[in-house]
């Protein structure tokens, strides 16, 4: 699947995805400062399902055509299986397809791929407005940030919470939650994933 955005420093002004793509290669092309850049297309959730938000795609993930295919990313998918968001037998190489199949969605603050932690705060902050627009259009039940840095930038302030509900943080009227960090202690991970499991089980049918 491919598309082209208008000129912009990060391609964030391209049209927001409405249709939910089927399984397969999720690569797309945007324009960044007038040059084509390969990235991953947004995978919108169904209304009143969960929207997971990361920082930006890794080059490994873009090359694979699927979200979160580096080491930390695959840990994220494993955690969603533990939380029963995804079936326990979900293949990691196409876990984003399984996420879409159960009604949830995924996007990033910044669509330009970089190495881990290479994206600047300024570049990530530039994507917050577009994220608001996506949430307003898609209307998920809640936003779940994969990483605390993404949550902090979207909130526009420091966050005390290590995981769970983010009081006072909402996007387009939707509540926001944070997953435990990739290197969080096991007890914290277990508590956080149980919390996420409870959120998912409370979603309307």
Residue ranges and their predicted role:
Residues 60-123:
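Short, surface-exposed acidic-centric catalytic microdomains
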Residues 101-154:
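Internal catalytic-core helix/loop-beta-alpha segment
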Residues 38-45, 89-100, 134:
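Short amphipathic alpha-helices and their capping/turn segments at secondary-structure boundaries
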Residues 52-55:
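N-terminal nucleotide-binding beta1-loop-alpha1 segment
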Residues 61-64, 153-156, 188:
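Short glycine-/acidic-enriched loop or helix-start segments at secondary-structure transitions
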Residues 57-59, 111, 150, 183:
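Short, glycine/serine-rich, charged loops/turns that create anion-binding
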Residues 2-47, 70-72, 116-132, 157-205:
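C-terminal capping/extension of enzyme domains
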Residues 49-50, 142:
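Structural motif
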